[in-house]
């Protein structure tokens, strides 16, 4: 029995504790909202209408709660509640005359009506809508985060060892193949040499007398990790060649004639599919191809087939340079023949030009004038491989296509030996002096350290040429003359023009070979094809440049990031690209690189990407709610505690409060809340004049005034930035903070991007500084401040400048100040809301839609994205719109108070009335006052004038709101999707229009032509092109010489 009761209790307790109360609460809210929504949609069509409804509800409800005490007339109660609900702060009755209950109601009204509270409450509505209408958004967002974190950790963890891992993987693929080659009994390995025979690399050296030395060593993973070189065979398509030793050194090596090392046993790789058969088939195909030597008198060139023949080739063909065995031809261009299969078989299309660098020329016994430092004149050229440790690169027939004419060889084609990376930096200007100074061309494998990796020159010339012609040749004919990058020529003294073929290093792609296709980065010299039938020069058409003009680094030393998607593996990120991505996104909150337009407009998103973006936005909103709740509650409580401690420690001010029948603790909390919420009401009858010689109260209240309104977006972004910097890397917490920093206006109305935030901070400093300077110039030595120290006078001026923003405290009698100071305060109250209003509107994601500018693009081509255009537009709209209300209110009050104005009372003048109206419309609360009363000038108005002031308060409270559409206040429903789609289309059209305008401007000014806005564009473009071509012909003379090979024309270029 007890067992059954215990089980029943546990079962019901477990069910009770597992109840999702949030689910039932959301269902209840949804049930109520579904009943009200059809009617509310008609009454409240947009956010501005809803905001009006909320403020009016607080005003009426507050008056109903305050009036029953009957300490004042209802019009005064309505005036108080309107001032508390709009943060205007004007009073017609002394606040201390109200009861404690009435003061508490005003306290709560001001707390519930601040912009922080209202816009922060929208975050709860958006959060509810996310969880209600998106199934499992929390779980799906968490899964996306774990996926991104795992991928990032795998990428970062594998980056330091990526180089050795790749090499070991490639080397293991050919284990067990070397012994098959050794069984052939013939010297079928390519002719090459190695400077270090102790490395685990298979090498073969062929000297002049035909002495063959062949080394085969067993591969070792540890050796691969240390040196970066594995067992190299021609089946791997990885070729290394050491330049010939000087003849004096080669004579000593002839004693090793006939030495041959047999192959050591190699363990067979245990695989279901041995790649041996595939490489054997490739080898059999290659054995049937021969090389043909291109010979000419003094100068011989690489034998390159036509583009049509290259397209027809079905596989990559290896190229192994053969050393020149004729000492008498050391100063000539020696063709490099490719030995495949046997040493006698030559291929007819894979001759390679091997260029000898200056370092080897200086160390060798052979003299070659063209390689003399800073010399250019020579009649014969020696091309040779660079000495140094050979590194391993991987090739494929699937590669990215790059035009060999796009990069100008302005300086030597050499590696960057500082970072151990292979880089090509395209230049945009021609500099003939650099050509003369750097007349030598280095091989890609110059003297580099063990940490540096170089590309093999033996194969890239042919393979790159094949890939480069698979582009559409008719695509960019106009680029051959318009773009400076269209000329890839390199002048070698008076010799032939040479070009550099490029390719990218990429990771394997999944294809029919099972992911065994690779490309390498090669830098080879290619000669332009010439047409010898009619003696005319024909330049190859340049394919479109596919990459931006940035320095590309391809090296095994760099940290490579591998992403897996759609069954393929790509080299998506290097260390530099990851840094560029980090600059684009503050955190790793997306698994893809977004295309973001102006004001955080995401363009061209798939459904999966939209779901992931919605998940990160949901988590960002959830985190932002926590931050704002702590911010709002904390700054409402902590300053009150601080002031309470201070006033109880200051007997003078404590006795002052007690003598006025004010509780010191209540004064502390009411004053701190009035400062932070920009209410402007005080329990003391003279506002803040009692504390004009106390620095603590003025400084603390000034800080609260700023961070409660104008400075709130600044401090909020600063808090988020500090939290982001101190957050744990790759955490869910940091991802959300990064999204808030990058795309704040997608989540919150009062959180701006970095540049508008700095702009707001600058405006805040300038406006307050201006008020302080005016005060110090005109009123610092006024008799009103007799008995006040100079330091406190400056502090009073600074405090009063802060009060002109929104709060309306008075630390001095404003009616006694200089007239110019009063006018400056009037202007500052009028524009007090503009910094926030402009920041809200110019950072609105749907700003164009809200402004209604989607009809037609600007025909005049004005850049609407410029901040000055937005600021000017908003200022014109805001100021012109506000003046109508102010003038109308002044007109009505002048009619209602006509008799008082006729009395010519200096304290009840038109300027004083205008000052009161602007203070009410700007929701500031400053007043000129009236003698004999301890309230605002509004206390002297009649009922009609008070109603006008109430209307000014309510209307002015809505000046800082966005226009009808703002994504931060929209719910993620069909309407928001429609606006997103409209914004995306507009962003694309805008980009295309700007791109066309920029293109027309560039063509119109091509060749330093006049700017005419695109008129007579075609004639001017043709004229400028002809002018440029004529300058080229006038600036240089060219001569062509036909070589013995009919496919080559040697072109000699010399400057006139």
Swiss-Prot record:
Residues 335-344, 521-533, 553-563 have a biased composition (Polar residues). InterPro entries: Cat_transpt, K/Na_transp_Trk1/HKT1, Trk1_fungi, TrkH_K-transport. Keywords: Cell membrane, Chloride, Chloride channel, Ion channel, Ion transport, Membrane, Potassium, Potassium transport, Transmembrane, Transmembrane helix, Transport. Residues 537-549 have a biased composition (Basic residues). Disulfide bonds: none annotated. The keyword Transport applies. GO terms for cellular component: chloride channel complex; membrane; plasma membrane. Its main location: membrane. It is a multi-pass membrane protein. Residues 1-46, 123-622, 711-754, 842-874, 966-1056 are cytoplasmic. It comes from the Eukaryota. It holds the Pfam family TrkH. Potassium transporter that mediates K(+) influx, as well as Cl(-) efflux as a secondary function. TRK1 is the major K(+) uptake transporter that regulates membrane potential and intracellular pH. The TRK1-mediated Cl(-) efflux should serve as a Cl(-) detoxification route and may play a role in sustaining C.albicans on mammalian epithelial surfaces, or in physiological saline solutions such as saliva. Mediates candidacidal activities of cysteine-free peptides, but not of defensins. The hallmark of salivary gland-secreted histatin-5 (Hst 5) killing of C.albicans is the rapid efflux of cellular ATP and other small nucleotides and ions from the cell as well as concurrent intracellular uptake of propidium iodide (PI). TRK1 is the channel for Hst 5-induced killing and histatin-5 may directly or indirectly alter TRK1 function, allowing the efflux of larger anions, including ATP, and the influx of small cationic dyes, such as PI. This is Potassium transporter TRK1. It comes from Candida albicans (strain SC5314 / ATCC MYA-2876). The lineage of its organism: Eukaryota, Fungi, Dikarya, Ascomycota, Saccharomycotina. The gene is TRK1.
